[in-house]
Amino acid sequence: MAADGRDGKKIDVDPKLLELLACPLTKGPLAWDPERGELISRVAKLAYPVRDGIPIMLPSEARTLSAEDVLAPPPRLSGPA
């Protein structure tokens, strides 16, 4: 899974890492949004950034999801199935 980083390079998130990560507030699952390079917690309504391939799992660094973001279909995972 990849998204563009700040310098235009692709940022990859290992699918196995995604399976292990959980929202630090709800302990629930996260979804990868490759378009924004964020890990999404729909329950907490937060989007955690991924910088240089490293998930920043601090609630203070997370973006609050809008009502539209929460209601939107979950992002599709890219890469091999």
From Swiss-Prot:
This is UPF0434 protein msl4429. One of its GO terms (cellular component) is cytosol. It comes from the Bacteria. Pfam families: Trm112p. Belongs to the UPF0434 family.
